[in-house]
Design a protein with these regions (language model features):
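Flexible "arm" and connector segments at domain edges
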Residues: 1-47, 51-81
Length: 81
């Protein structure tokens, strides 16, 4: 992958992760539902955007689904302790 495409992919991925972080913190502060704005649709939107970027990483052979699943399993097991 050429450097400018890699930089673009990494930049957009970082931005999408930041947006997911923002909605997660809004849920922590205000709950999933309040009078101002329900958070579930926003959470779905931002989590989906991050998933899209992970798919781009796989398509561009930066990571594999197997590697991601292995890491996810490791993290899940660690959190379950």
């Amino acid at each position: 992958m050429e450097e400018n495409k890699l930089n673009e992919l990494m930049s957009i991925t970082a931005e999408e992760c930041a947006e997911l972080t923002q909605v997660c913190m809004k849920v922590v502060r205000f709950g999933m539902n309040n009078d101002y704005k329900p958070k579930r649709p926003w959470l779905i939107e931002e989590a989906g955007d991050v998933l899209c970027m992970l798919k781009f990483m796989v398509e561009n052979e930066l990571v594999t689904w197997e590697e991601l699943e292995e890491r996810a399993d490791y993290k899940r097991n660690k959190l379950m302790k």
